[in-house]
């Protein structure tokens, strides 16, 4: 029987079904739009929010530093590390163990020290803070300030993939160090060191690196005997170096 609009029951059902389909379509569109807005916010916001204060550092003294290396290339022992600038264990290594190694072995001509990039903490992040920080550090290295830039990165780090190493922040670190900003920005914007960083990563992976910091003495992985997941102590590394020097 037709209703007040003159529609049969079959036509009423068809109209109801069309309304439901339209409503479902609008809900789906709404979900997609909201999702896109959230993703856009997560990607864009870290690079538009205020940079905030930068904790300055006192420039260090690094014997025979050349880009991401330190010491005499002809030293009898080679020390290599693979690190991610968003890694808290790397920060601890850099601040508490590395200075002792530099003082006792690198500065004395016994060890040639090479830092390798191993950015992986940002693998599932759209902002790629580990990779961007790695490139920025190498751009600073062009001006002889790799190790100071490494220091300012760790000094200002306060969390993984939360905007600490957003592009604008990385530029602010370079400004704090007094770098030539035209040169730095040109290098940074071009992602100049991407291929070298990728090579570092692949080289580390081929050696068995899967976490950071990973430390090698003359190509031999340094292990903490207290546990395979523990970062080697200064004593662990020094013992390996001393053994290599004694050969």
Predicted regions and their residues:
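C-terminal cap of thioredoxin/glutaredoxin-like
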Residues: 2-47, 98, 171-247
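A generic structural signal for short, solvent-exposed coil/turn residues
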Residues: 18-19, 62, 71, 105
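Ser/Thr/Pro/Gly-rich low-complexity linker/stalk segments immediately outside membranes or between
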Residues: 47-61
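A short beta-strand-turn-helix
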Residues: 60-77
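Alpha-helical scaffolding within the catalytic cores
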Residues: 64-65, 97-102, 202
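Short, flexible, glycine/charge-rich loop motifs used to bind or transfer phosphoryl groups or to couple energy/partner
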Residues: 68-70, 104, 204-205
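A generic helix-loop boundary/linker signal
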Residues: 69, 123-127, 139, 187, ...
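Structural alpha/beta surface segment adjacent to cysteine/selenocysteine redox centers
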Residues: 75, 80-175, 207-210, 236-242
